[in-house]
């Protein structure tokens, strides 16, 4: 690969193939280990922080590079606040990059509950905060039950 995109906290493995040499030893280095660290023998890249780094694979005098871009995970919700009547439901839709397990939690289950798929049910009048989390990113939705 000439380029790769990896999300912070995730890994990818770069492979280098050498032809014509029986016992060729390839070593990997990173131009910026604080952004993308690489195991010098396996080529496994760990994304550490947002930014770019160039991973170099070297065998003897031959070098090849791969530009690695590290992105922060994102979580986008279809709404930041919601209104629902007692006994009725509304839904929060979450989009995460990279995709992962999204969790929903009500800060006050006596006012509003939330299911594992983001469906909010109004229990009694008041306000509650719904916390949505994925890949270490947290967002909140203020729910008003009428």
Which ranges hold each PLM region?
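Extracytoplasmic soluble-region selector
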Residues: 1-146
